[in-house]
């Protein structure tokens, strides 16, 4: 301990476990107890890494009778040891019951005592006791037919029992053998060859913060119509005060683009883009340390060899999501084929990733760009903006018809239109800025001083400006404007002169 202090100096602190076990208490040399660090409580998994749902049903009461109404599914869902026990027990009871029935018939007819009489015809030949009756039933049920024991035509009750035995044996065989076949052919073992990465990662992809994990198929047989879904399990409290311990939210992994439909021949990286619609819109690297959530991944598809639907599941808790990591590439191009290296399937490496959430990144982008017009946040502002646009349209429609025709002509100087539109756009952009920025923007630079002074002089005394001082191109434009003004009514000419003065 002293060697560590000499190496690291006074900054070294000893972290000891408190006696109560409720947290960690760091202490430094010559210092009293510091603030107690309470460790984050680990979330109980809803779905294990192997796909098993960690749920137990209790206090069913009378509802347990529903299991008997679907007896076949109940037997299939049982564990193998119980299936084998029921299989052996059912056949043993059925065999003993039918053997007892044949023995009862032989006993009631007196065949057990008269079987050795030469001229006596028993119901079943060569049945003297219960073991011989049991062997006769087994030979008949298994269709072995040794020929030593057989039923005669002098026993109608034996014929009826023989028919009942055949029907009952077929039912038992169909039920138990079918149950065992379905249990053996279940695609649960096929899910063992579908792999999920041990961790999920968050990093930038195509300029967007993205949650990613990897899936793979170890077999050469394909999964037909493979589809993947993701659920976010997180506890929350509603505004009404209701607590939801397992609130399920859908994570978009490409529903609109079809990216959720997988061609699972080689390992694929599943992506969830974190945007304003994502539940992780507010998630940052720092806030993830205090969050508690679970991402459940469900991969479904049809097994190519059997045609049965297979489902593989796994989950990722907040501790299994790595911020600023990316998966190591596993596919390489060899001579004539692609090779997949599954030894690097779970491997990740660090990449530069902003530690901020998408919401924080958007806010910082808005703060760093002051020229961006403020967003319309409520319906009142949106309504006022629409009214302003309608007012501009009304002003243009209230002009005299002659002016409307002149401005609507194709040969109207486009340069003037561009100049006017540029001026108006600049005025609108300056009007959207704060007052301090407007005053700064209104100060002309060295390169624009002459232009601004000349423009001010022209605007202050437009009537005294000589047309001859203008460039030739502007002289023609000014002459055209003078002719257009001469064609205006007297009232409009007076309005124009009042505006200039």
From Swiss-Prot:
Molecular function in Gene Ontology: G-protein activated inward rectifier potassium channel activity; inward rectifier potassium channel activity; phosphatidylinositol-4,5-bisphosphate binding
Cytoplasmic side: 1-80, 180-501
Descriptive protein name: G protein-activated inward rectifier potassium channel 1
Reactions that this protein is recorded to catalyse: K(+)(in) = K(+)(out)
Annotated site residue numbers, Role in the control of polyamine-mediated channel gating and in the blocking by intracellular magnesium: 173
Coiled coil: none
Gene: KCNJ3
Top-level taxon: Eukaryota
Glycosylated residues, chain numbering: 119
Regulation of its function: Heteromultimer composed of KCNJ3/GIRK1 and KCNJ5/GIRK4 is activated by phosphatidylinositol 4,5 biphosphate (PtdIns(4,5)P2).
Extracellular domain ranges by topology: 106-129, 149-157
Transmembrane segments: 81-105, 158-179
UniProt-annotated stretches for the region Polyphosphoinositide (PIP2)-binding: 182-209
Residue list for modification Phosphoserine: 385, 424
One family name in Pfam for this protein: IRK_C
Lineage: Eukaryota, Metazoa, Chordata, Craniata, Vertebrata
Family recorded in the similarity comment: Belongs to the inward rectifier-type potassium channel (TC 1.A.2.1) family. KCNJ3 subfamily.
């Amino acid at each position: 301990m002293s060697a560590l202090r000499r190496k690291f100096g006074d900054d070294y602190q000893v972290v000891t476990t408190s006696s109560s076990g409720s947290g960690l208490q760091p202490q430094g040399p010559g210092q009293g107890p510091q603030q107690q660090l309470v460790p984050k409580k680990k979330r109980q998994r809803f779905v294990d890494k192997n796909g098993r749902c960690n749920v137990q049903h209790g206090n069913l009461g009378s509802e347990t009778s529903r299991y008997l109404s679907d007896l076949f599914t109940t037997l299939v869902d049982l564990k193998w040891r119980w299936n084998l026990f029921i299989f052996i027990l059912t056949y043993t009871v059925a065999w003993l019951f039918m053997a007892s029935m044949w023995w009862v018939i032989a006993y009631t007819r007196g065949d057990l005592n008269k079987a050795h009489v030469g001229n006596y015809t028993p119901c079943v030949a060569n049945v003297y006791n219960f073991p011989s009756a049991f062997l006769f039933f087994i030979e008949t049920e298994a269709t072995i037919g040794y020929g030593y024991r057989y039923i005669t035509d002098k026993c109608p009750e034996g014929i009826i029992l023989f028919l009942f035995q055949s029907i009952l044996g077929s039912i038992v065989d169909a039920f138990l053998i079918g149950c065992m076949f379905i249990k053996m052919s279940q695609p649960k073992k096929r899910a063992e060859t579908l792999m999920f990465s041990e961790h999920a990662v968050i990093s930038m992809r195509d300029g967007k913060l993205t949650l990613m994990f990897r899936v793979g198929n170890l077999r050469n047989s394909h999964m037909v119509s493979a589809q993947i879904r993701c659920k976010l399990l997180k506890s929350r409290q509603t505004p009404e005060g209701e607590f939801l311990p397992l609130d399920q939210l859908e994570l978009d992994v490409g529903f609109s683009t079809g990216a959720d439909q997988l061609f699972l021949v080689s390992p694929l990286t599943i992506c969830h883009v974190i945007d304003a619609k994502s539940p992780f819109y507010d998630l940052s690297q720092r806030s993830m340390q205090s969050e508690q959530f679970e991402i459940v991944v469900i991969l479904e598809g049809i097994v190519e060899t059997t045609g049965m639907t297979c489902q593989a599941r796994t989950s990722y808790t907040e501790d299994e999501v790595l911020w600023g990591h990316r998966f190591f590439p596993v596919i390489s191009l060899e001579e004539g084929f692609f090779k997949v290296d599954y030894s690097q399937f779970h491997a990740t490496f660090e990449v530069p990733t902003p530690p901020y959430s998408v919401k924080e990144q958007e806010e910082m982008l808005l703060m760093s760009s002051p020229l961006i017009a403020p967003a319309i946040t409520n319906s009142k502002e949106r309504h006022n903006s629409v009214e302003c646009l309608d007012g501009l349209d009304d002003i243009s429609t209230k002009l005299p018809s002659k002016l409307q025709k002149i401005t609507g002509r194709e040969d109207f100087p486009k340069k003037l239109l561009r100049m006017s539109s540029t001026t108006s756009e600049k005025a609108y952009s300056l009007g959207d800025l704060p007052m301090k920025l407007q005053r700064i923007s209104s100060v002309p630079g060295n390169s624009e001083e002459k232009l601004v002074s000349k423009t001010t002089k022209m605007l202050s005394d437009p009537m005294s400006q000589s047309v001859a001082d203008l460039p030739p191109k502007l002289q023609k434009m000014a002459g055209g404007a003078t002719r257009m003004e001469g064609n205006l009514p007297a009232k409009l000419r007076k309005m124009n002169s009042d505006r200039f003065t």
